[in-house]
Amino acid sequence: MIPRRTALLLVDVQQGFDDPRWGIRNNPEAESRMAELLQAWRDRGLPVIHIQHCSTDPDSPLRPDLPGAALKEATGPRPEELVIQKRVNSAFIQTPLEAHLERQDISALVVVGLTTDHCVSTTVRMAGNLGFTVFLVSDATATFDRGGVDGHWYSAEAIHQIHLASLHGEFCTVLSCSDLLAGLEGGSEPLLPPGSSPRRGSDFQAGASPLHRMKGPSFGPERRQGQEPAPPSPRGFNTAPFAKELP
């Protein structure tokens, strides 16, 4: 059976990223891959979580009062799916995401979205540090060309690949959409790499699909069940009013 505790996390798949001011982007088919995965999750009744960035930058197209803050229609939420709004790069900082995953006993995440090197990377790193098993889908994420401190411009594809390389094996397992879907089609395939264990009790079982054969992430010590979470970061600001769960 498909593991019930594996959630699809769609990070910042918002209309504002179509703004030409972002510049040249890689992976033009990323949203199509996201839509494929979203449909697969829905078909199997697996949990889906949408993350929406509400920027406080007055020049950002992702400001909550602008049309660009809206989630893209092709991957938008259904009424029963959870939407969590954030104001910083990590989807975990001062949002109800971790508490929701705790309540639902979700121990593994499949992460897709925008952009690879900013909110996707930050969310993946924090999820790994919190003890979740994380899978990042390489062709369902994307980024933009960026300038370095020395004035050199780096291509979106180079930035994308470097971030995938730095995340894989340390914070997550990176794999393609086709490999992930092949694993789902296996029916009993666990979304767990060899040698890893679920964050909490779950129904994952051994298997041998492409997912199971891939090198798994190495995590730090897990937080013990029942242990109080760390207090909110003093750097941040209270985003609780901006986090919501749909019915």
List where the protein language model places each region.
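N-terminal nucleotide-binding beta1-loop-alpha1 segment
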Residues: 8-13
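Short acidic, Gly/Ser-rich segments with clustered Asp/Glu that frequently serve as metal-coordination loops
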Residues: 16-20
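Short catalytic helix/loop segments, enriched in acidic residues and glycine
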Residues: 25-39
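Short, glycine-rich nucleotide/cofactor-binding loops
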Residues: 21-28, 112-116
